[in-house]
Amino acid sequence: MAESINSLEELGTVAKTEAAAPVDVQKLDAQGRAYATGKRKDAVARVWVKPGTGKITVNDKEFEKYFARPVLQMILQQPIVASNRAGQFDIVATVAGGGLSGQAGAVRHGISKALTYYEPGLRTVLKKGGFLTRDSRVVERKKYGKAKARRSFQFSKR
């Protein structure tokens, strides 16, 4: 702000020109897909989102086959349902590490991030639903002198 400001109106116009918020743009690869990684516990998911018919593939299998439990299928679909984009995107995910619950959470996190990269306007909806936040809870390590992380060995008075 090297120029001098003489009135409040000039201050307002200078503030508007300098503080123009950067417009969110799509982050797409050469094939027109949005890519994101999601993490949960020990699982890491790599997710690609592209326009399509709503087909979700996890590790080259349909997600209903890979995640057989209905609860895990629901977890996977939460960001799509919350953003009202059911049937509009094809999703391909590869996930490794952890168990099925952690993998479902990792794919959900990756889908949420990829949707915001493809359609930045969805960020507020997904952020409000808590889908963009990395769940940082991991298993607590076992301590020596204990049976598990916190459980002590059985104690006998006599």
Curated annotation (Swiss-Prot):
Output the Pfam families linked to this UniProt entry: Ribosomal_S9
Q: Which SUPFAM superfamilies match?
A: Ribosomal protein S5 domain 2-like (SSF54211)
Does Ligase show up as a keyword for this record? Answer: no
Report the GO molecular function annotations: RNA binding; structural constituent of ribosome
CC annotations in GO: cytosolic small ribosomal subunit
Name any Gene Ontology BP term.
translation
Is this entry keyworded Phosphoprotein? no
Keywords linked to the UniProt accession: Ribonucleoprotein, Ribosomal protein
Question: HAMAP family in the record, alphabetically?
Answer: Ribosomal_uS9_B
Q: Which family does it belong to?
A: Belongs to the universal ribosomal protein uS9 family.
User: What name has this protein been given in UniProt?
Assistant: Small ribosomal subunit protein uS9
Name the source organism.
Brucella melitensis biotype 1 (strain ATCC 23456 / CCUG 17765 / NCTC 10094 / 16M)
